Amino acid sequence: MQILTLITALPGAVAQGLIWGIMAIGVYITFRILDIADLTVDGTICTGAAVCIMMMLSGHNVWISMLAATLAGMLAGLATGIFHTFMGIPAILAGILTQLSLYSVNLKIMGKANQAINVDKYNLLVSLRHIKNESLSKNTIFIVAVMCILLIAILYWFFGTELGCSLRATGCNPNMSRAQGINTNMNKVLGLMISNGLVGLSSALLAQYQGFADVNMGRGSIVIGLAAVIIGEAIFGRIFRNFALRLLAVIFGSILYYLVLQIVIWMGIDTDLLKMLSALVVAFFLAFPYWKGKYFTKAKQGGK
């Protein structure tokens, strides 16, 4: 185990962390703001990647392809929202149904189980090759970092508007929101569309970065997103109180997740166990507040 090998691999881990961080922000919107466990993510990841790759293979501009991937993700969120609000299906089951449907959709989009794209033949925005020894205009880490900052700024502005505040109120207290005349069903659909749109954008970047799209590339994505959210909150929660900084904490959580993942691989731990380790990490951080309240909080004495 040479330390130089680990150092060489760290920039790639940071790049992946930034890309998946955009997806994690989407998960944050549903999980923390709307208080919905949305499992559509596992299918949307592949849908966005498939749309982006196929459009670029058809000769479309990279920005147009990424926009199409984002819109495809928003349509997936719309489907989940309709299942949940219009048809009365529980949110978690609605996400599973959409995810299941997207598997067939993704196969139809790509025509087969996977599609590759060559960085030498196509003008990709990001790539695994463009991490080191590149100018800032081509450096993957710099480009994705700028995109993350812009997205956080846009989301910070949006959730400060009247519509954004009503969306946050819907997740915080839906009954009170309805009493104030807020259309909570519409807000849930909108939140799911924004969330999955971000997932679609993230997957478009991921497909370019790794050079292919695959129907199984989204498996376990929700665990990665939750891990980024939970790690970011656990480490930076006491420091980052502002909404924009909380979104930034999610990005940092994603980067830390991939840095730890890279260290685990460098240490020679069986990679087949990585998904299980990720699930255990998420379970631990989700359970910690409960354990803290139940086992470590001193009982109040004499009504004090």
How should these model regions be labeled?
Residues 31-86, 134, 239, 266:
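Membrane-embedded helix boundary and interhelical linker motif in transport proteins
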Residues 16, 92, 119-121, 140-145, ...:
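Loop-to-transmembrane alpha-helix initiation sites
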Residues 91, 95, 99-160, 190, ...:
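Transmembrane helix-bundle core of multi-pass membrane transporters
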Residues 60-100, 105, 148-149, 252-253, ...:
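Alpha-helical transmembrane segments within multi-pass membrane transporters and channels
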Residues 76, 137-218, 222:
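Helix-loop-helix "hairpin" substructures at the membrane interface of multi-pass membrane proteins
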Residues 1-23, 59-64, 132-138:
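Membrane-interfacial amphipathic/re-entrant helices at transmembrane-helix boundaries
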Residues 199-203, 209-275:
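Transmembrane alpha-helical segments in multi-pass inner-membrane proteins
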Residues 172-179, 183-186, 245-248, 260-304:
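Cytosolic-side transmembrane-helix boundaries in multi-pass membrane proteins
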